[in-house]
Amino acid sequence: MFDSIFKRKQDEQRFASEGRLPPGQAYTQRFPVLHYGSVPGFNAAVWDFRVWGEVEAPLRLNWAEFNELPRTKLVMDIHCVTKWSKFDTYWEGVAVRTLLEQGLVKPKPQARFVMQHAEHGFTVNLPLEVVLQENFLLATHYNGEPLTPDHGYPLRGVVGAIPAKAELATPYFWKGAKWLRGLEF
């Protein structure tokens, strides 16, 4: 046990010296579960994902349609505002910029922010330029497996740091909503 604690501390110091561990963060190999309230159920027959607001035309996709969209796989470091960081996490899902490239979503020129709408009325916003970066993903999978309900199954927004890409904005992990149902531009 003490060997693993010592190794974690060594890794933490190495990550900090490499600039991957932000000040005040602690390195973890676990994936903590943090949310308030109950975990919503999922019914593929009635679930939908919507895009609306400052877009040329609203979009609504059911679960099967959403899963037909081109997939993106990313390796990201995640930093939670509760002071933990996890490195080299593997995610799969749909990049918002793919929705634009496919012509499914066309933001109007005045669109500047994107509000993520999730179950239980939770919302969180990000600047449009962050949502269109490669470090923002509408994630369905983590480490090769579908998300677990506690981690946002079936869909969550994920924003993290891509190692060796310091030019990307790195908002903390909480800026990605669990149990995501739509995006409002």
Segments and roles (model prediction):
Residues 2-185:
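Structured, non-membrane catalytic/scaffold regions adjacent to prosthetic-group chemistry
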